[in-house]
Structures are given as C-alpha cells and as structure tokens.
C-alpha cells in the first residue's frame, strides 16, 4: 500500500501570496484547535491505518507511543476485524494502552449499525468515531460488499444512538458538495474529505488476482478539490489524503480544514526509524507548521483561513465547472 499513489493530490497547485516582513516569532504561534469539547494542542492527527494482525500490533504500538510523546490524537484502522474476531482486539487496544489519556478515534464501516459502532467505541474506550465511506473499494474487491442499500439506515442509526462525536470520512476518493449535502441532511456535522493522492485502494485491488476495475485509478476528487467543494457549507471539515508535509498541512488549514490527518508520514517515520528518532522527526514536523505560520504572518489557525491563495489553472477550471 505504501507505493500506491497515482491519483492527483493537487497541493502543489495551491500557492500562498508571500509576505516579506513578518513580525512574529515561534513562541507567539498558537496552533491549538477546539473541537469535540476537547482542546487539541496541534491541528494534526494520526489517521486510520491498520489493525487485526501481529504486524499491525507492532505498528499500532509504535504509533501510540509516538502519539503519546507528541500529544497527538490518533485513529485506529477499521475495527471490523476485532468485531468479527475478538482475538485480534489487542492489535487495536494497544492504542489505548500506550496512549491512555489521549484522544482516540475508533473506525468502522457502514456495513455496521449502531450496535457494531458501539462495539468499536467500547473496544478502544474511544473519544470519537470515524465512519468510513469506501464504496469504490468495496466494488473493486472480489470479496467486497456490493450492496449499499442499508448504508443510509445504518448511518442514521449510528448518529442517533452513539454518545461520542461522529466523523464521516472518505478513504481516498474525496467528497463532492453533493455528498456533503446528503450527509448534512441526515445530521452529520463533521466530515473528513480524504481525497486522492494518498493510498490508492483501486490500484491495490487492480493488482490483485480477480480484483479491481481497470481505468478507475484516478476516480475521485483530490483533497484540495474536496476542500473547495466544502467551502461555505454548514459542516466541520477535516482533511486527509496525500498530505505529505507541514506545508500541505498549512494549505489544508488555509482552505478551511479544522484539522488535518496524515497516515503515510507517521507510518514511514515509525517503520524507518527507532522510536526516539521518530519522535524527534515528528516534533520537527510540528515545529515546521509553526515556522510556516511565522513567515505567513499567521498567529492562529483562524489567521491562516484569511490568507489569499493562488490556484493553478487546473484548479481554476475545476472551480469554474463546479460553480455552474
């Protein structure tokens, strides 16, 4: 999965207007975010990745220790495996074991109703629940669920029953304004647009025997396009999908994201380096966000949302067509 990144991410098509006379220093920068009745120290979180195997136990333990050391929120991979096979629970519960006071998102798909969602929350003593939308992935998987007739009913069941905040997230195909409107209409108030540019599940399935849909590798909206789609809609927006570095994070925040999720960056750092080095590199990444805010003359996240942005003609064309 680490190499499956063929669809566009578009972050390089967004530019800030430079400002050459900043009057801030790093100690003046306030990166905190208030969300879900919680104050997050940083506007980034470790997004959903893995669980259910011995390797996942090892990786999730490292990610949880990293989150603990850097005061970051973290999301689990889909807890479907743990619900179906309780013997795999430990590979998920290591998140709470090693990040006992941390903010943890459980993750479940819409093949589950409120009962399954609550099981997922209980396994992690989770602070919030990600409900993922992955129809293209399911269609492309030979063993995937091809019947989505219960998705709407299950989502309404979850929204009306669970007591923790619910985030409806894509899994790398982005969200259109039509999707967002339909979610808001059933009571969703927080989304993670999760656009193209990160892990490409269609490409992964296309490389499996008997799976995939050829030609669908570039299906979806990029994270940037999805953030533009969500502009001025009555919903709290989180961003993920192909976010590579601190500069991409800052661009997401400027485009209106409340927080930004990264998977690849954090997975790479814990796989490639000893934990202490991974912690140092993560702290440098977080410091880079503040450094970028200094040169942009932005003391808070709210200041970033007021910065003028320049778009490449490709994005201007997208905006023009989507405003018709």
Ranges and model annotations:
Residues 1-36, 40, 314-315, 320-323:
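An N-cap/entry alpha-helix motif that binds or orients negatively charged groups
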Residues 1-2, 266-324:
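C-terminal extensions of enzymes
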Residues 34-81:
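Active-site cofactor/substrate anionic-group-binding motifs, chiefly glycine-
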Residues 34-38, 62-69, 92-100, 118-125, ...:
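Acidic (Asp/Glu)-rich catalytic clusters
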Residues 44-47, 72-77, 103-108, 131, ...:
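Hydrophobic faces of well-ordered beta-strands that scaffold small-molecule active sites
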Residues 46, 67, 129, 191, ...:
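Conserved, mostly hydrophobic/aromatic
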Residues 55-57, 80-97, 111-116, 137-160, ...:
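Active-site-adjacent beta->alpha loops and helix N-cap segments on the catalytic face
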Residues 150-272:
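Glycine-rich phosphate/ribose-binding loops and adjacent secondary-structure elements
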């Amino acid at each position: 999965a680490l190499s499956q990144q063929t669809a566009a991410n578009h972050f390089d098509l967004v530019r800030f207007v430079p400002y050459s006379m900043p009057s801030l220093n790093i100690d003046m920068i306030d990166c905190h975010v208030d969300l879900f009745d919680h104050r997050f120290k940083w506007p980034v979180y470790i997004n959903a990745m893995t669980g259910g195997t011995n390797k996942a136990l090892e990786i999730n333990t490292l990610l949880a220790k990293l989150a603990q050391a850097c005061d970051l929120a973290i999301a689990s991979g889909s807890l479907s495996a743990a619900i179906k096979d309780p013997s795999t629970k430990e590979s998920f519960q290591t998140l709470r074991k090693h990040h006992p006071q941390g903010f943890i998102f459980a993750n479940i798909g819409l093949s589950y109703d409120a009962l399954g969602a609550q099981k997922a929350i209980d396994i992690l003593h989770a602070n919030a629940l990600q409900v993922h939308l992955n129809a293209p992935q399911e269609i492309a998987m030979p063993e995937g669920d091809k019947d989505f007739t219960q998705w709407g009913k299950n989502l309404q069941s979850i929204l009306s029953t669970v007591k923790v905040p619910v985030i409806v997230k894509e899994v790398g195909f982005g969200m259109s304004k039509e999707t967002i409107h339909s979610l808001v209409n059933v009571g969703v108030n927080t989304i993670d647009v999760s656009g193209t540019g990160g892990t490409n599940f269609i490409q992964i399935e296309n490389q499996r025997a008997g799976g995939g849909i050829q030609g669908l590798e570039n299906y979806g909206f990029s994270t940037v396009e999805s953030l533009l789609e969500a502009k001025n809609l009555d919903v709290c927006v989180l961003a993920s999908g192909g976010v590579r570095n601190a500069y991409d994070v800052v661009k997401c925040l400027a485009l209106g994201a409340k927080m930004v999720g990264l998977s690849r960056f954090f997975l790479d750092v814990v796989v490639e380096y000893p934990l202490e080095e991974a912690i140092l590199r993560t702290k440098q990444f977080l410091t880079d966000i503040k450094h970028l805010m200094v040169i942009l003359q932005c003391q808070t996240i709210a200041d970033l949302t007021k910065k003028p942005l320049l778009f490449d003609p490709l994005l201007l064309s997208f905006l023009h067509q989507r405003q018709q």
